[in-house]
């Protein structure tokens, strides 16, 4: 079970990711002062249902594993830049356009 302070910080960052933008698991970790993308992924797997989980993606730009079909309509609704949409299971987020920098000012007060 992830540390409660770490969990709270991860969820606070994810709640602040604007519609149409994404952060990678690593970016979320760096934003809170940690370099633990796997730990961020664990928090999202356990507690991410309460926040916009589709806005946190692997560095590959793929949607969250196992949630590709559920995430696609959310990306389309939010106008998240996508690339290579071949099917509801096969697409990527265009990170060059959609990625929110982990240095963004909206995260300045969320640190471990």
For each predicted feature, which ranges?
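Nucleic acid-binding interface residues in structured DNA/RNA-binding domains
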Residues: 1-112
């Amino acid at each position: 079970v992830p540390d409660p302070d770490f969990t709270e910080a991860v969820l606070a960052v994810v709640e602040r990711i604007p519609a149409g933008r994404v952060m990678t698991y690593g970016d979320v970790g760096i934003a809170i002062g940690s370099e633990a993308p796997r730990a961020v992924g664990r928090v999202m797997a356990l507690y991410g249902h309460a926040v916009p989980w589709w806005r946190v993606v692997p560095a590959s730009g793929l949607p969250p594993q196992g949630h590709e079909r559920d995430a696609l309509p959310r990306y389309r609704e939010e106008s998240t830049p996508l690339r290579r949409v071949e099917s509801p299971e096969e697409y990527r987020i265009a990170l060059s356009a959609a990625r929110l920098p982990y240095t963004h000012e909206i995260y300045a007060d969320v640190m471990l």
